[in-house]
């Protein structure tokens, strides 16, 4: 599944971390200062990102990238029928179905979230060919670490 993710996504990937993304951003800032160029950053943190993953869309995405139907079905069965309740000072509310989100603490959740987020970014038009900051012949317009995204560009 890592082959579906671009280099700009460092979240939950072996040998990658937040330090890499911070170093990339610092390097861009230093080069911009050195060459007296204006650059812009937009920092985005998706609130409750893991809880917002729509299951039906996730299964569609997995199918589109070529995940075998048997595996998608297995993942669907893991998520199906999940229920929750809320306990408060006066008791608990009725149980309700959970129709969104990837399981917190599940070893597959980070990978599933990354694939879901990548689909959103691709559909937002943030491909490498779009405007960004040219680094080694490539346009880099965003850096990501799981649900944290930094959009970048210059005037």
Residue ranges and their predicted role:
Residues 1-155:
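Nucleotidyl polymerases of mobile genetic elements and RNA viruses
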